[in-house]
């Protein structure tokens, strides 16, 4: 799987690139694992915009993804590798020996027909889910839990992989793709391997209309607005922002200001902050 480039047949294809779908083995999802979801278009319950630049986009069916991997000791065979419009990685359909079907994130290199399993006694092989205490140091992992049994929260994007670097006491030390090094309880589980579709970050959108297909509306710069609309607005011609530092439309510092809460509970678990 790679990136497909286009010739400049039209201005819209000049810089366009898309992911190849050669790894996908099925076009329609498993109906029992899909559901519809109301799209809020960035509005709250009163219809007021609370998240700008959202709206439109193609209709989507949501897939139920198993982030918990809580079917312990029951082998499952990979039936298909499918496209998911709600994330940039692929998903794999698992057929368990007891007859149940579930979707999981597709690890890079996992093939149709292979067998995977979850649990503390699972072998150390691609796609298996184990507690962090059972995983050797230096192993690449993804879909990492933050609280035991809660389901994977960390390293779920396409191409993501974290590394287990140390074990001490009740915690293990994990290096995340962002460069952050943090502690995680050793009872938490993770999946062996790297998330698939590693070239997703190299895709070029190419034209404005493709952003609209994804449900993203135009982002207008504050400096070209009127003073009533943005603190950067106004002036004669191409005027500077007129402030010592850039701010948001509501006057808060922007572009470089750290937004993480100072008293967040997980600060004590972070050894080195992200780059």
From Swiss-Prot:
Top-rank taxon: Eukaryota
Gene3D superfamilies, alphabetized: 2.30.30.30, Nucleic acid-binding proteins, Ribosomal protein L2, domain 3
GO molecular function terms attached to this record: rRNA binding; structural constituent of ribosome; transferase activity
Any GO CC annotation of this UniProt entry: mitochondrial large ribosomal subunit
Region Disordered: start-end pairs: 29-60, 225-252
Keyword DNA repair: no
Compositionally biased residues, Basic residues: 51-60
GO annotation, biological process: mitochondrial translation
Entry-linked SUPFAM superfamilies: Nucleic acid-binding proteins, Translation proteins SH3-like domain
PROSITE patterns: RIBOSOMAL_L2 (PS00467)
Protein localization: Plastid, Chloroplast
Principal subcellular localisation of the protein: plastid
Key words, A-Z: Chloroplast, Plastid, Ribonucleoprotein, Ribosomal protein
InterPro entries: NA-bd_OB-fold, Rib_uL2_dom2, Ribosomal_uL2, Ribosomal_uL2_bac/org-type, Ribosomal_uL2_C, Ribosomal_uL2_CS, Ribosomal_uL2_dom3, Ribosomal_uL2_RNA-bd_dom
Family (UniProt): Belongs to the universal ribosomal protein uL2 family.
Subunit structure: Part of the 50S ribosomal subunit.
HAMAP family per the UniProt record, alphabetical: Ribosomal_uL2_B
UniProt-recorded name of the protein: Large ribosomal subunit protein uL2c
Originating species: Chlorokybus atmophyticus (Soil alga)
Lineage, top ranks: Eukaryota, Viridiplantae, Streptophyta, Chlorokybophyceae, Chlorokybales
Encoding gene per record: rpl2
């Amino acid at each position: 799987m790679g990136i497909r480039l286009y010739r400049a047949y039209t201005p819209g294809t000049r810089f366009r690139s898309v992911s190849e779908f050669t790894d996908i083995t099925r076009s329609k999802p498993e109906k029992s694992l899909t559901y519809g979801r109301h799209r809020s278009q960035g509005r709250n319950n009163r219809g007021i915009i609370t998240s700008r630049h959202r709206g439109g986009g193609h209709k989507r069916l949501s897939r139920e993804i198993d982030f918990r991997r809580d079917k312990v000791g029951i082998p499952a065979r990979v039936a298909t590798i499918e496209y998911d419009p709600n994330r940039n990685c692929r998903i794999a359909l698992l057929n368990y020996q007891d007859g149940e079907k579930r979707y999981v994130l597709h690890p890079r290199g996992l093939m149709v027909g292979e067998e995977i399993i979850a649990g503390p006694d699972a072998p150390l092989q691609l796609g298996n889910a184990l507690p962090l205490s059972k995983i050797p140091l230096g192993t690449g992992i993804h879909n990492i839990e933050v609280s035991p049994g809660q389901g994977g929260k960390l390293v779920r994007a396409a191409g993501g992989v974290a590394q287990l670097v140390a074990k001490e006491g009740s915690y293990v030390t994990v290096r995340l793709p962002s460069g952050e090094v943090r502690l995680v309880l050793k009872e938490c589980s993770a999946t062996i391997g790297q998330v698939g579709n590693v070239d997703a970050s190299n895709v070029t959108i190419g034209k404005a209309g493709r952003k609209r297909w994804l449900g993203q509306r135009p982002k207008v710069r504050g400096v070209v607005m009127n003073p009533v609309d943005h603190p950067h607005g106004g002036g004669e011609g191409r005027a500077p922002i007129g402030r010592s530092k850039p701010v948001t439309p509501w006057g808060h510092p922007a572009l470089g200001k750290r937004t993480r809460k100072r008293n967040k509970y997980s600060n004590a678990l972070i050894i080195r902050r992200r780059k």
